[in-house]
A protein has these predicted regions:
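Divalent-metal coordination cores built from histidine and acidic residues
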Residues: 1-7
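Well-ordered secondary-structure scaffolds
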Residues: 4, 12-24, 28-190
Length: 190
C-alpha cells in the first residue's frame, strides 16, 4: 500500500510533503503497536532532507504527531553526507553489521550513531542514564545476545535460521568490493 501511495505522491508532486511523509512513516509504526520509538532522521546528500532545516522540521513533525498518538517518541538527526560505516551497498553493509555484532571490529562513526540511537531508546523505556544504557548495549554485544536477536529477526523475515554462520555464502555474488590504494594521504570530499 505504501508503494502505491508513494507513486501517487510522485505523480501529483507531493513526494516532499512533510505531513504526508510523517503519516507514511508513523502510520506503520503506530499500527504495529509500538509504545516507544526513536527515529533516525537523515540529512545530507544521501537523504531526502538536503538541509538541516528540512530535517529539523520533519523530526519535529514526527515527534509531535507521535506524541499526539500517545507514542513516546524522539528523533535524532544524523548526517548522510558520507556512509555510516566503512561500506556502501546493501550486502556490504549487512556484512559490516554482522561484523559489528559478532566481533569488536566496529567503525567509530557507526558505533557512535548506533550507541546514540540504542541508548536513546533504552533511556526512554527503562528510565535509565546514558551511562547505564551504554553498559547494557556493550553487554549484549559482548555476550552475543545482540547477534542472536539479529539472527532471529532475519529468520522471522524469511531468512536462514543460521544466517550468522552462513552469511558469506548467502551474500556471495550480491556484492562487489574493490580496495583502492592511494599514493598519498588525504580525504575524499564532495
Amino acid at each position: 500500500a505504501d508503494k502505491k501511495l508513494y507513486s501517487i505522491r510522485d505523480v501529483v508532486g507531493t513526494v516532499e510533503s512533510l505531513p504526508l511523509i510523517t503519516s507514511s512513516i508513523l502510520s506503520k509504526k503506530i499500527a504495529s503497536g509500538v509504545t516507544s520509538l526513536v527515529l533516525d532522521v537523515k540529512v545530507g546528500n544521501g537523504s531526502f532532507n538536503s538541509t538541516i532545516q528540512i530535517a529539523e522540521k520533519l523530526a519535529k513533525s514526527l515527534v509531535n504527531v507521535a506524541k499526539g498518538a500517545d507514542l513516546k517518541c524522539e528523533a535524532l538527526i544524523t548526517d548522510m553526507n558520507q556512509v555510516l560505516g566503512k561500506s556502501a551497498g546493501h550486502s556490504l553493509e549487512v556484512i559490516e553489521c554482522i561484523e559489528y555484532l559478532t566481533t569488536t571490529k566496529r567503525d567509530k562513526r557507526l558505533e557512535i550513531i548506533t550507541n546514540d540511537l540504542a541508548s536513546s531508546l533504552l533511556m526512554m523505556i527503562n528510565n535509565i542514564s546514558k551511562e547505564e544504557a551504554l553498559k547494557k548495549i556493550n553487554s549484549v554485544l559482548d555476550n552475543g545476545l545482540a547477534a542472536e536477536k539479529f539472527e532471529k529477526m532475519v529468520h522471522a523475515l524469511g531468512g536462514s535460521n543460521s544466517f550468522l554462520s552462513s552469511y558469506e555464502k548467502q551474500l556471495a555474488g550480491n556484492s562487489y568490493s574493490e580496495e583502492i590504494f592511494l599514493n598519498e594521504s588525504g580525504w575524499i570530499k564532495e
